[in-house]
């Protein structure tokens, strides 16, 4: 443990001793270890003394001690011991965090001023040159206002993080000098707040207070870089190829490298790059097409990581399905095939038009073109795009190939089943329902598919992000004495959303831009992106099953409140500072807001008529775009919430940190089962055996089974409906994952067409599937393990959940026979027994049962049909 849990008098004959921070040796004292743990248990809020046993924790710690263990190592051992016991009760997880935080506090200064000074005066030991970790501006502000800033920092709030949230901060977010952490979490939050607001001390302090209360969080690049010498605080960059030439391609490549170096994720539109075998006038040669070029981008993403090794570089590449290289494009991430035709470190997305979806549905023809020979397709959308496509399609000898649209469609499905990609976004919906439609045709989204912004060769779109911790807005119902009776505080959400809007707007002006084109775009259009995390936790707290009518209603109400608040704040900023440069001509300037573009009427909770009038006649807006629910992969782990707007994927899972793997139980479920008196190691093992589900476990009440459904037990139609419902109040888009346990082409087709017809902009971010056999199983009791069922794949505590890789087998591989084309339906090569197994599995998957058969396509109803599943 730490120094005050060690005997004061050294004893050379002692079998166990520790090495203190000053190098001296002292005996291990069981009593003092116990006393130290007891002290941390008694901190407010006190841990449940009937559950948490300091003596047992101390016994386990002592059993792992070795002679010469360092006090910091002893603390880490104690924290890990408590974390392993968190499946008994969440309070053990809190204890683990308290031990870890206490350990960090003993290794770092409690003075923010001293910490900043140390970072500013850091000298690189290898070069012997000054290498400040914080900016001169931050240093001068802290030196000038140090006493005031110190007075508002509440270090006690460091203890509010759970063990895994704290470990995520410790691993990547807190500043280090020579490998040793020098920041506390509260130091980081104050650094970020001052980095955003500078000399505006009151705004900085208010931001710090709200961040430390865990009401919201800024995005990872902001937490990384705010207050540093190069404060690149933006998350998302959207790049368009400068031009289809060597100069244009390599200029774009350099831009991507500079952005990635500064911790930005990138979306690249490559529609304008000529297809393979296209004529090159300058050399009288032919083009190699997209694949060799993208392999160069792939190597750049690998080489130039984000923030100096904190995160890998990440590029998403967007292509429209009329491009002649589209078949090679969608295969680039596959695990099999020629290596020179693969670029697996990039992410791939299709920018899909309505006319393509219609042709697939009708089993019609689809023409593929080279953009050099059929110009303008990437620069148009909706009816203009349709007219141009039809014109080119009817031009003799212009199409490179004419295929059946379903041939390309099923190649897309095959790639999605194997790799989880390509992402699917609907080009016409993205353009038709954008407040930037006055600027021109939007040609791509970003890395995570939630940012929809205009780009051009001279403008790289940028977006600054933050997410709201929704569980913090659930409170006890006013007037009720029942602590379980909850309500959602929309007024408080309104106030915090306004604060976030102001913060993100300030970042636009104070940000460091790695390339000039990004600064040009961001200052002209001033878009921001506000997201959410913990929606599933809100529903559980309010005792609303995720697929209930009440949850569907609250889902829309939350989205409406956030949109109204962000618009209100942006309008108030416009009154003070003026509208953004390109406001004139935008839909908002004409009184058309996002829900109008969806033909949705908002509720009467907020005064929309007054707000519209204010925007049109009394000041406009400061920001062109405002709402963009993102994945929140890392930041939701820091704050201890479920990701973004998604249901839980499992009620029990494994989380890996540097110290090892830990079993995690949904803490709210655990508390409910403990209250009923039915939580036990046997119950835990039953949940493990059921792969994180409680639906088949006897003794658990039906209302809890409804409340704790996992995403695999919720109909995919419900998730799409909820995405569309809140979509009317999302002026960018949302990182919408699709969950199908055992995907078939029929299920995927049904899901995609349902999403498209519901009007979603992002039809699919990742396809999340469930492996038939999971890679890692927990140990279960022999009685339970007689009929073992593996649990969910491990989730790394600092990275998003990865889609399990699936290699096509005989049940989902397309035949390579020349006769197997889309003039007649493609067949699975499956046996009758395999087909029966698939049908049985299909019936078992509740989340797909109403989407499994799509009869909108032309189909002969032949045995093994991919479309209808017959």
UniProtKB/Swiss-Prot annotation:
- Residues of the ATP-cone domain: 16-110
**What GO molecular function annotations does the UniProt record carry, in alphabetical order?**
ATP binding; ribonucleoside-diphosphate reductase activity, thioredoxin disulfide as acceptor
Active-site residues are 446, 448, 450
SUPFAM superfamilies this protein is in? Answer: PFL-like glycyl radical enzymes, R1 subunit of ribonucleotide reductase, N-terminal domain
Catalytic reactions of this protein: a 2'-deoxyribonucleoside 5'-diphosphate + [thioredoxin]-disulfide + H2O = a ribonucleoside 5'-diphosphate + [thioredoxin]-dithiol
EC number of this enzyme: 1.17.4.1
The UniProt annotation puts the region (Disordered) at 789-854
| UniProt enzyme class | oxidoreductase
Disulphide bond pairs:
236-463
Q: Which residues are annotated as site, described as Important for electron transfer?
A: 765-766
Chief location of this protein within or outside the cell: cytoplasm
Give the matching InterPro entries: ATP-cone_dom, NrdE_NrdA_C, RNR_lg_C, RNR_lsu_N, RNR_R1-su_N, Rrm1
Instruction: Give residues annotated as binding dTTP.
Output: 244-246, 261, 274, 281-282
- In chain numbering, the residues marked as site (Interacts with thioredoxin/glutaredoxin) are 865, 868
Q: Mind listing the UniProt keywords for this protein, alphabetically?
A: Allosteric enzyme, ATP-binding, Cytoplasm, Deoxyribonucleotide synthesis, Disulfide bond, Nucleotide-binding, Oxidoreductase
Q: Site annotation (Important for hydrogen atom transfer): which residues?
A: 236, 463
Biased segments, Polar residues type: 812-831
Residues binding ATP are: 20-21, 26-32, 71, 75
For bias type Low complexity, the affected ranges are 796-811, 832-844
What does its activity-regulation comment describe?
A: Under complex allosteric control mediated by deoxynucleoside triphosphates and ATP binding to separate specificity and activation sites on the large subunit. The type of nucleotide bound at the specificity site determines substrate preference. It seems probable that ATP makes the enzyme reduce CDP and UDP, dGTP favors ADP reduction and dTTP favors GDP reduction. Stimulated by ATP and inhibited by dATP binding to the activity site.
> What cellular-component terms does GO give this entry?
ribonucleoside-diphosphate reductase complex
GO BP: any one term:
deoxyribonucleotide biosynthetic process
Q: What does this protein do?
A: Provides the precursors necessary for DNA synthesis. Catalyzes the biosynthesis of deoxyribonucleotides from the corresponding ribonucleotides.
Q: Which family does it belong to?
A: Belongs to the ribonucleoside diphosphate reductase large chain family.
Could you give the subunit structure recorded for this chain? Heterodimer of a large and a small subunit.
Q: What protein name applies here? A: Ribonucleoside-diphosphate reductase large subunit
* Source organism of the structure: Dictyostelium discoideum
Ranked from the top, the taxonomy reads:
Eukaryota, Amoebozoa, Evosea, Eumycetozoa, Dictyostelia
């Amino acid at each position: 443990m730490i120094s005050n849990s060690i005997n004061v008098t050294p004893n050379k004959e002692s079998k166990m001793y520790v090495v203190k921070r000053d190098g001296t040796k002292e005996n291990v004292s069981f009593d003092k270890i116990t006393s130290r743990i007891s002290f941390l248990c008694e901190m407010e809020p006190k841990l449940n003394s009937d559950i948490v046993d300091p003596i047992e924790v101390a016994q386990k710690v002592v059993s792992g001690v070795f002679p010469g263990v360092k006090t910091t190592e002893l603390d880490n051992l104690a924290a890990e011991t408590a974390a392993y016991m968190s499946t008994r009760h969440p309070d053990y997880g809190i204890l683990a965090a308290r031990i870890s935080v206490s350990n960090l506090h003993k290794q770092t200064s409690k003075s923010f001023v001293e910490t900043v000074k140390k970072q500013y005066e850091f000298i690189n030991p290898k070069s012997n040159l000054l290498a400040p970790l914080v900016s001169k501006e931050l240093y001068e502000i802290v030196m000038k206002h140090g006493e005031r800033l110190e007075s508002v920092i509440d270090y006690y709030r460091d203890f509010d993080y759970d063990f895994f949230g704290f470990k995520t901060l410790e691993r990547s977010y807190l500043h280090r000098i020579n490998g040793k952490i020098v920041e506390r979490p509260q130091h980081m939050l104050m650094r970020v707040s001052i980095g955003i607001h500078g000399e505006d001390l009151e705004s900085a302090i208010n931001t710090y207070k709200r961040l430390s209360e865990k009401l919201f969080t800024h995005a990872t690049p902001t937490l990384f870089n705010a207050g540093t010498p190069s404060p690149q605080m933006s998350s998302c960059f959207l790049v368009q190829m400068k031009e289809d030439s060597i100069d244009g391609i390599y200029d774009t490549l350099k831009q991507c490298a500079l952005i990635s170096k500064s911790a930005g994720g990138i979306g690249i539109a490559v529609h304008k790059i000529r297809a393979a075998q296209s004529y090159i006038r300058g050399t009288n040669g032919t083009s190699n097409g997209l694949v060799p070029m993208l392999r160069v981008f792939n190597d750049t993403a690998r080489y130039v990581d984000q923030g100096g090794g904190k995160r890998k570089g990440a590029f998403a590449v967007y292509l429209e399905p009329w491009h002649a290289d589209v078949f090679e494009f969608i295969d680039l991430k596959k695990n099999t095939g020629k290596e020179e035709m693969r670029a697996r470190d990039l992410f791939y997305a299709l920018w899909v038009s309505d006319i393509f979806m219609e042709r697939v549905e009708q089993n019609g023809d689809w023409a593929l073109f080279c953009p050099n020979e059929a110009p303008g397709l990437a620069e148009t959308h909706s009816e203009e795009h349709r007219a141009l496509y039809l014109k080119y399609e009817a031009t003799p000898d212009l199409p490179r190939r004419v295929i059946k649209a379903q041939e390309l469609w099923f190649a897309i499905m095959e790639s999605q089943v194997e790799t989880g990609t390509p992402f699917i976004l609907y080009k016409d919906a993205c353009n038709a329902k954008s407040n930037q439609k006055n600027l021109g045709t939007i040609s791509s989204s970003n890395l995570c598919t939630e940012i929809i912004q205009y780009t051009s060769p001279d403008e790289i779109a940028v977006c600054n992000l933050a997410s709201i911790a929704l569980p913090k807005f659930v409170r006890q119902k006013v007037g009720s004495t029942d602590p379980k009776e909850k309500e959602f505080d929309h007024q408080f959400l309104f106030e915090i959303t306004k604060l976030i809007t102001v913060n993100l707007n300030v970042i636009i002006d104070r940000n460091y831009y790695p390339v000039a084109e990004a600064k040009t775009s961001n200052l002209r259009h001033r878009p921001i992106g506000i997201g959410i995390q913990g929606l599933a936790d809100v529903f559980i707290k309010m005792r609303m099953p995720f697929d209930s009518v009440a949850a569907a209603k609250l889902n829309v109400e939350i989205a409406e409140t956030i949109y109204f608040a962000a618009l209100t704040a942006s309008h108030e900023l416009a009154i003070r500072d003026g509208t953004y440069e390109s406001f004139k001509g935008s839909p908002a300037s004409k009184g058309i807001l996002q829900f109008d573009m969806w033909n949705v009427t908002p509720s009467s909770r907020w005064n929309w008529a007054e707000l519209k009038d204010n925007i049109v006649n009394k000041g406009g807006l400061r920001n062109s775009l405002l709402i963009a629910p993102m994945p929140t992969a890392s930041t939701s782990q820091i704050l201890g919430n479920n990701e973004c707007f998604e249901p839980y994927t499992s009620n029990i899972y494994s989380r890996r940190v540097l110290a090892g793997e830990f079993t995690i139980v949904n803490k709210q479920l655990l508390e409910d089962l403990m209250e009923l008196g039915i939580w036990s190691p046997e119950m835990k093992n039953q949940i493990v055996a059921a792969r994180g589900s409680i639906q088949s476990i006897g003794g658990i009440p039906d209302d809890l089974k409804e409340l704790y459904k996992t995403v695999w037990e919720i109909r995919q139609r419900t998730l799409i409906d909820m995405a569309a419902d809140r979509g009317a109040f999302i002026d960018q888009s949302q990182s919408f994952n699709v969950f199908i346990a055992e995907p078939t082409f029929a299920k995927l087709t049904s899901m995609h067409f349902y999403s498209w017809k519901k009007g979603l902009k992002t039809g699919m971010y990742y396809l999340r599937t469930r492996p038939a056999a999971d890679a890692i199983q927990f140990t279960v009791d022999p009685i339970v393990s007689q009929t073992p069922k593996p649990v969910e794949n491990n989730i790394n505590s600092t990275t998003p959940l990865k889609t399990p890789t699936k290699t096509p087998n005989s049940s989902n591989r397309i035949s390579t026979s020349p006769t197997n084309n889309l003039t007649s339906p493609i067949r699975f090569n499956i046996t009758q027994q395999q087909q029966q197994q698939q049908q049985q599995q299909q019936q078992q998957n509740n989340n797909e049962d109403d989407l499994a058969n799509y009869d909108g396509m032309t189909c002969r109803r032949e045995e093994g049909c991919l479309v209808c599943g017959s």
